[in-house]
Curated annotation (Swiss-Prot):
Tubers. Not detected in root, stem, leaves or flower bud. It is found in: Vacuole. GO terms for molecular function: serine-type endopeptidase inhibitor activity. The record marks 95-96 as: Reactive bond for trypsin. Disulfide bonds join 76-125, 174-191. Has a single chain structure. Induction: Not induced by sucrose, methyl jasmonate or wounding. Belongs to the protease inhibitor I3 (leguminous Kunitz-type inhibitor) family. It comes from the Eukaryota. This is Serine protease inhibitor 7. Residues 1-22 form the signal peptide. GO terms for cellular component: vacuole. Residues 23-28 form a propeptide. It comes from Solanum tuberosum (Potato).
Amino acid sequence: MKCLFLLCLCLVPIVVFSSTFTSKNPINLPSDATPVLDVAGKELDSRLSYRIISTFWGALGGDVYLGKSPNSDAPCANGIFRYNSDVGPSGTPVRFIGSSSHFGQGIFENELLNIQFAISTSKLCVSYTIWKVGDYDASLGTMLLETGGTIGQADSSWFKIVKSSQFGYNLLYCPVTSTMSCPFSSDDQFCLKVGVVHQNGKRRLALVKDNPLDVSFKQVQ
């Protein structure tokens, strides 16, 4: 039933878009699409790289970074972590790849997107830069964020950026099965919150019921 509802929901923008589309009147973004802003107040650009930083300071702060997962047999670093404080190393740069990229280079709230670590790597490790949600971890009681995802595919790699109820933004994981038919949706019934759990003394990004991670975005110069 939920899948049927989601399909109906996703068809609405298709009807709206197709009714106004001609070769002389190209598809435009929904009128209520709100650009995601970085800490400088500039709109995020899919061609640029950003660090995902905390909206808090001190022990409550810390950038997001790529690191080695405990007990992982992956040939490359594949864990997504957050530093234990904002005093220390900078996070690993990322870029955001929107599912509606044919509308332009902007990144918008509630838009389905992929997240990729923007780093130089070997050919072997290229696929270990794209975010996804891994299998259920029984010891932690949740699913952990890791790399090894796929850009533009309906698997475990779709996320959203939404405005936080407190400060900055939240990240959501949205396991939809029909991606391009519904690039924008403010209905988060089908999305799960991204937060932090503690794994071997580190803060690991994971799916949570409460206390989602509040983040901001800082452009890498």
